[in-house]
Amino acid sequence: MTEMFAIFVEPFQFSFMQNALLTALVVAVICALLSCYLVLKGWSLMGDAISHAVLPGIVLAFLAGIPLVIGAFVSGIACALGVGYLKENSRIKEDTAMGIVFSGMFAIGLVLFTKIQTSQHLTHILFGNVLGVSQQELIQTAIIALIIFILLGLKRRDFLLYCFDPSHARVAGLSPKLLHYGLLTLLALTIVSTMQVVGVILVVAMLIAPGITALTLTNRFDKMLVIAIISAVTASLLGVLLSYHFDASTGACIILLQAAFFLIALIYSKIKVRLNF
């Protein structure tokens, strides 16, 4: 028992591990909450699109000498607006528009990045570096997360109605277009805050895995939120510990655990259905 406690406590004697854990936990909660809405709306590809599209914004922000999160956020919103414009003003379907917009923006980002940065910096942006999070970056992530949490709390029922049935939301006196872009804005903010943990490539997993894990286990939205948060927080905590003891990528460990939790939930739900019959 003492040995197990030592294994758990040992990493957190270092300040960089404390920052990493706190950042991962904060991001896990926000991703889990938003994940439930994205899964219900069927926006998994939208999360992937915006997460890749932030790269040129990061590069341009670096060149301009402004905070990278500002560039990432603006770039993410530009991607969302671009997809919306193509969908409304052409015969292109939304998923096709996402594919061309995010791949084009990601390619622009890669070209720009190779001209001004080394491969080491590129790896940091693509795959994240939560172990390198400073106290200032932790506070910045916490502030962004708090904004997202408050907005989701205030508009929880409106977003839920929009995700289930936009037509019903319109009849209820809500603006589906406003809710659409509001949810996209929250998605862009979440991606910006998550980028430091798992990078732009793996961020979509943190935005989808908690939601589909919860949806596999329950049909009630309130319960879904709780399960998503528990699975995401547990994966982040264990992922940070595993990455320390096995000298592995922290972001990858977190994503692997979330994938494992989904598989366990899927198997459990199948067994439960068979037993009921």
Task: Describe the function of each predicted region.
Residues 138-210:
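Helix-loop-helix "hairpin" substructures at the membrane interface of multi-pass membrane proteins
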Residues 4-19, 90, 97-157:
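Transmembrane helix-bundle core of multi-pass membrane transporters
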Residues 6-15, 29-40, 57-67, 158-168, ...:
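Short juxtamembrane and helix-loop transition motifs at transmembrane-helix boundaries
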Residues 36-118, 214-226, 243-246, 269-271:
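Short loop segments and helix-boundary regions at transmembrane helix junctions
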Residues 251-277:
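Cytosolic-side transmembrane-helix boundaries in multi-pass membrane proteins
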Residues 24, 28, 32, 59, ...:
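Small-residue faces within membrane-embedded alpha-helices
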Residues 201-252:
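Transmembrane alpha-helical segments in multi-pass inner-membrane proteins
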Residues 20, 68-76, 95-99, 142, ...:
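Loop-to-transmembrane alpha-helix initiation sites
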